[in-house]
């Protein structure tokens, strides 16, 4: 099964997507939380053996530096004019946000003009159509990456688990469907609650995408950071 997720245009685009979920001014976001979400996303891509561009890894190292500085006790700076990497990053994000808004406005104008001169290209955008409440597959993937990061922390504190490599998507689809034997909806947390390995979580996530693709389940999230609900499709 091919994994086709919406690509971000670069690390700043990914960060802006994460920041926008807080619906506050860029300079007011909880930066450590955003950094942890970014790092979880990169770690999940690597766990799924997906290629991660060098620029994303470079940004990850910069974010780890900012995170470590934020977690250290606050002290009076002996050199107040020293560059602040966090403020530099937030300034870059704000500049990128303004640029992106302008680019989208220009693109919309171009599309409006194109309607009068050419027949629009027919496309089926799977990732932006299958989830409800304006959520995309990428939003679901970001939520999953945070869950996997938390699950790995839990597993690392428990007994050693031997990785099993022969999980099958078809089997995991059945596992998910069992959650709907006695009810019409469940949560993402409930679906992944019994996972014991990273491979199991990844295969279960791919099985969920396949069920969505087959219109057997729908995924809902009423607001940013709220529970993700899986609902059985009515026949």
From Swiss-Prot:
InterPro entries per record: ScpA (IPR003768)
Main location: cytoplasm
Alphabetical UniProt keywords: Cell cycle, Cell division, Chromosome partition, Cytoplasm
Pfam families xrefs: SMC_ScpA (PF02616)
Entry's Gene Ontology cellular component terms: cytoplasm
Keyword hit for Cell division: yes
Similarity section: Belongs to the ScpA family.
Biological role stated in the UniProt entry: Participates in chromosomal partition during cell division. May act via the formation of a condensin-like complex containing Smc and ScpB that pull DNA away from mid-cell into both cell halves.
PANTHER family in UniProt: SEGREGATION AND CONDENSATION PROTEIN A
Quaternary data: Component of a cohesin-like complex composed of ScpA, ScpB and the Smc homodimer, in which ScpA and ScpB bind to the head domain of Smc. The presence of the three proteins is required for the association of the complex with DNA.
Descriptive protein name: Segregation and condensation protein A
Source species of the chain: Streptococcus agalactiae serotype V (strain ATCC BAA-611 / 2603 V/R)
Gene: scpA
């Amino acid at each position: 099964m091919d994994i086709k997720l919406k690509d971000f245009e670069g690390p700043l685009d990914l960060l802006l997507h994460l920041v926008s979920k807080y619906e506050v001014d860029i300079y007011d976001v909880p930066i450590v939380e955003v950094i942890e979400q970014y790092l979880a996303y990169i770690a999940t891509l690597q766990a799924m053996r997906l290629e991660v561009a060098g620029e994303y890894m470079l940004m990850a190292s910069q974010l780890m530096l900012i995170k470590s500085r934020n977690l250290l006790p606050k002290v009076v700076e002996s050199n107040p004019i020293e560059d602040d990497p966090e403020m530099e990053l937030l300034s870059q994000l704000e500049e990128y946000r303004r640029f992106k808004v302008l680019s989208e406005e220009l693109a919309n104008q171009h599309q409006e003009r194109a309607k009068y001169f050419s027949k629009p290209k027919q496309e089926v955008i799977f990732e932006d159509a299958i989830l409800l409440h304006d959520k995309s597959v990428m939003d679901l993937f970001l939520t999953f990456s945070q869950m996997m990061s938390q699950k790995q922390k839990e597993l690392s504190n428990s007994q050693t688990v031997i990785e099993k490599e022969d999980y099958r998507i078809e089997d995991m689809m059945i596992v998910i469907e069992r959650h709907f034997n006695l009810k019409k909806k469940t949560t993402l947390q409930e679906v992944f609650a019994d996972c014991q390995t990273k491979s199991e979580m990844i295969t279960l996530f791919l099985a969920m995408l396949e069920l969505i693709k087959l219109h057997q389940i729908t995924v809902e999230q009423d607001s940013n950071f709220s529970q993700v609900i899986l609902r059985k499709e009515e026949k």
